Amino acid sequence: MYKKAYGTIETLAPLHVGATAGEESGNLNLIFRDQFTLTGIIPGSSLRGRLRAEMRQNPELGEAEANYWYGDAAGSAHSEVNNESIVKIEHASIVWLPVFSPGQPIVWVTCERLLKRYNRITQKKLTIPDPYTGSSILKPRQSQNKKTLFFNLGFLTVNKMENLSAWFPDGQELPAVVVKDEDISMIHDMALYRQSRVRLKSIPVNEMLKLPLEQ
């Protein structure tokens, strides 16, 4: 009988999980996404591969132990044999997404659907905040009796503020806001870390040796 457990991943640097270098065309951002919110997810296979690599590098455990817990790697001699992994890992989805906002400088954004999923997995049975609810330590701009946040694509109005610390895994409240499900995909794409790629022209070594040297 399997035992269920959940974990929380905190990314300390921009994370890209999607197409590899040979599968992209131009600067398309081909990432794995949740089909409802269109926000990024980490496939369970990627998490299992990372955990397998960590275990394989441990001298006290090694390759055999990694294959026992996570199954044989694709392409290995035993990959075609029914060697099912002991540990089953589902995909990881976003709970809070950091978004740049002048004056904050970071606002953590989520939506109702993502919080409902977090509520279901953790079995905390918390009350889902209403859309456009800000955390109690958020510092929105006051203008015409309205509280607003500024993002790159425009302003967002905060209707009310309350303590959201129960929704953060470590229990520490951060500047945050809950938005509608239909708004999170646009904010998500705005907050993505984009990195352009440049490919230099390849020159054979024999031709490179013929190039004139600058004096």
Question: Residue spans of the language-model regions?
Answer:
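Basic, Gly/Ser/Thr-rich N-terminal segments that form RNA-phosphate-binding interfaces in CRISPR RAMP
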Residues: M1-Q215
